[in-house]
Regions:
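Substrate-gating cap/lid region and adjacent catalytic-acid/histidine neighborhood
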Residues: 1-111, 130
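Alpha/beta-hydrolase-fold serine-hydrolase catalytic core, especially in secreted/extracellular enzymes
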Residues: 61-64, 75, 100, 104-197
Length: 197
């Protein structure tokens, strides 16, 4: 994944959103309640957040400190659900800048969203000035990830072990009974091939 040499041994802060893949599923899988779209978003998001965070940390093999963050805000398990969007790709930039082309669908002006924005800005400032964002570093043993969420009035964060592995995601896909095997194969070919397979 990444070449191992001294030039790549720099501290990294890797952030992803819970439903990173929600906007990448083609419109022909709409409506949002369609089982094929739900399958593509669920597992595409799991593979996307894993490959952009923990897979990178694993590939570095301890050559540099790594911190992982996962933005749950807006996703299916969030205190604030953003229907049809979830915790979409780019939500980090919207939270940091206050600018969003999703303003009609995703109100990021609530006290909770603003507190989450402040928490993210502080973590980035701390990382840039001190070399640490203020939570436990990821290691192969801890698999630490800071999960960030908000309701309408407050920000919430919790440190836990990273929720997935590539193997656990693939096993969940195989066990998922929401689609037939033929439907799964079609969805995986049309929407996940080229990303993860």
């Amino acid at each position: 994944l990444l070449p191992r040499d001294a030039r790549s041994a720099v501290p990294l802060l890797l952030l992803s959103s819970a439903t990173e893949f929600s906007g990448l599923v083609r419109d022909d899988l709409r409506p949002a309640s369609d089982p094929a779209r739900a399958y593509a978003v669920r597992y595409g998001s799991a593979l996307c957040r894993w490959s952009s965070t923990e897979a990178v940390a694993e590939a570095l093999g301890g050559s540099a400190p790594v911190w992982l963050g996962l933005i749950d805000y807006g996703g299916a398990d969030s205190r604030t659900i953003l229907p049809g969007l979830g915790s979409f790709h780019g939500i980090l930039l919207a939270l940091l800048s206050g600018e969003s082309s999703y303003a009609r669908c995703a109100d990021l002006s609530s006290e909770g969203a603003q507190a989450l924005s402040s928490r993210l800005k502080q973590a980035l400032a701390d990382f840039m000035t001190s070399g640490t964002p203020g939570w436990a570093e990821w290691t192969p043993q801890s698999r630490a990830v800071l999960r960030l969420d908000a309701d309408s009035t407050a920000c919430f964060s919790s440190l836990s072990a990273y929720p997935d592995t590539r193997e656990s995601i693939r096993a969940a896909m195989a066990a998922d009974a929401s689609l037939s095997d033929a439907e799964k194969e079609t969805v995986e070919h049309l929407y996940l091939s080229g990303f993860y397979f």
